[in-house]
A protein has these predicted regions:
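N-terminal Rossmann-like NAD(P) cofactor-binding module of classical short-chain dehydrogenase/reductase
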Residues: 79, 85-89, 110-112
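Glycine-/Pro-rich loop/turn segments that contact NAD(P) or position catalytic residues
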Residues: 93-209
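N-terminal Rossmann-fold NAD(P) dinucleotide-binding loop
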Residues: 20-24
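Conserved N-terminal Rossmann-fold NAD(P)-binding element of oxidoreductases
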Residues: 11-18
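Helix N-cap at the beta1-alpha1 junction of Rossmann-like dinucleotide-binding domains, i.e.
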Residues: 43-46
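C-terminal catalytic/substrate-binding lobe primarily of soluble NAD(P)-dependent oxidoreductases
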Residues: 182-324
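Conserved Rossmann-fold cofactor-binding substructure of NAD(P)-dependent oxidoreductases
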Residues: 67-84, 95
């Protein structure tokens, strides 16, 4: 018992890309909360490189491990070996469900930053459920919370917590809304979330997080919540200008985003929720050209006897967000 009280938080972090790197740095800046972390990824060398970079700057004890987050049995083995207080999933949204399954089996709390979406959007089993949801809900985005919210009772029965969407958007945006609702307003009628990125790092085309996920999200139909139902738009159909403090005036476009779904469920009486993100003309022109020639497709193609997914091939050519 004394040993348990002495040890602070032990966190297993799955993922070592751009978003993961930011989360890992932040954990290491808060050693009193995160006294021990294990960084695990399919490529252990990336974890080792980050560990080497950080360990002289923090009191947090850092270890690394190799794991394939697509395989529940590998995740279970790692969780049982490391015995964390919680698992932080900053891998790909494709892997949310396998990591949640492993946490359930090991009875360990779960945290993530983005909701589930499938890697293969042509999978017949997933497609049948997706098309039913499109008709019932009224939006066609590939990602939604239904898959993860379905775990609610199982997590409750296991006595563990799943904290979903704990990045900035979703995450901080939901906290801001809840705080405003509790401390400033009797009623919130409309919520507009504006996401602005003011830099390009000198590249004609780059994404600030995983290119595959980013481009799938941006090239899809937009949607917003109004008067109790979803309203869907064409990609980039709704454009607004906004003068952002310190950044200046930017063009922003309405997108579908996951916190619209959770806020609509948790903000009583809200009449409209929208999400906007800024994009420069160069980004949009590049994206449209890539889409027109099929490079944003998630469907596998055969190239000289090898099966490749165009958007995954494109990801390999673009700047790594972790390097920006």
């Amino acid at each position: 018992r004394k040993q348990e009280e002495k040890r602070m938080g032990r966190l297993l972090i799955i993922g070592c890309g751009g978003v993961a790197g930011v989360a890992i740095h932040k954990c290491c800046q808060n050693s009193k909360t995160f006294s021990e972390i294990c960084i695990a990824s399919r490529t252990k060398e990336k974890c080792d490189t980050l560990k080497k970079k950080l360990e002289a700057t923090t009191d947090t004890k850092i270890t690394t491990a190799q794991v394939d987050a697509d395989k529940v049995e590998e995740l279970v083995s790692l969780i049982r070996s490391y015995q964390p207080d919680a698992v932080l999933n900053v891998a790909l949204p494709y892997q949310d469900l396998t990591i949640m399954e492993a946490c359930l089996e090991c009875k360990v709390d779960y945290i993530d930053t983005a909701n589930y979406e499938p890697e293969d959007t042509d999978d017949p089993e997933w497609r049948a459920i997706y098309e039913k949801r499109c008709k019932e809900a009224g939006f066609t985005a590939y990602f939604d919370y239904s898959w993860q919210w379905a775990y609610r009772e199982r997590f409750k029965e296991a006595g563990i917590t799943a904290l979903l969407g704990s990045g900035f958007d979703p995450g901080v945006t939901s906290v801001f809304t809840a705080y405003a609702m509790k401390h400033y307003f009797d009623q919130i009628d409309t919520i507009d979330i504006l996401d602005c990125n003011g830099g390009d790092h000198g590249y004609p085309f780059a994404t600030n997080f995983n290119p595959e996920i980013n481009l799938r999200e941006v090239s899809a139909n937009g949607s917003y919540w109004e008067n109790g139902h979803w309203v869907e738009t064409e990609p980039m159909e709704i454009k607004r200008e906004y003068n952002f403090p310190q950044v200046g005036e930017k063009d922003m476009y309405l997108l579908h985003h996951e916190e619209i779904e959770s806020l609509a469920k948790n903000v009583p009486g809200v009449k409209r929720i929208r999400f906007f993100m800024t994009f420069g003309q160069s980004y949009l022109t590049h994206m449209k050209c890539l889409e027109n020639v099929g490079m944003l497709s998630t469907s596998p193609i055969n190239y000289e006897g090898r099966e490749i997914v165009p958007i995954q091939f494109l990801k390999a050519l673009l700047p790594d967000p972790a390097s920006l």
